[in-house]
Swiss-Prot record:
Stretches the record annotates as Disordered: 48-70
Record bears the keyword Ribosomal protein: yes
Taxonomic path: Bacteria, Pseudomonadati, Pseudomonadota, Betaproteobacteria, Nitrosomonadales
Keywords: Ribonucleoprotein, Ribosomal protein
Species whose genome carries this gene: Thiobacillus denitrificans (strain ATCC 25259 / T1)
A Gene Ontology term for the protein's cellular component: ribonucleoprotein complex
Annotated HAMAP family: Ribosomal_bS21
Similarity-based family: Belongs to the bacterial ribosomal protein bS21 family.
GO molecular function: structural constituent of ribosome
Gene Ontology process terms (BP): translation
Gene transcribed to yield this protein: rpsU
Name of the protein: Small ribosomal subunit protein bS21
Source domain of life: Bacteria
Bias kind Basic residues: ranges: 48-61
Amino acid sequence: MPHVKVKENEPFDVALRRFKRSIEKVGLLTELRAREFYEKPTAERKRKLAAAVKRQSKRLRSQQLPPKMY
């Protein structure tokens, strides 16, 4: 669990911003959202496979030469 020590004469919103940034860096909120409901192992594998296919197709699209515009 990330923690932030509030420095002397530091505004609360600055400390809160540092805390939010540390939580985001650790990935706590994304893990919490993923564990909110039970996901069957087959559904998890299917979701991860679909994400991998999407990433691969996106990578291939970015590597292709753009069409000639004339």
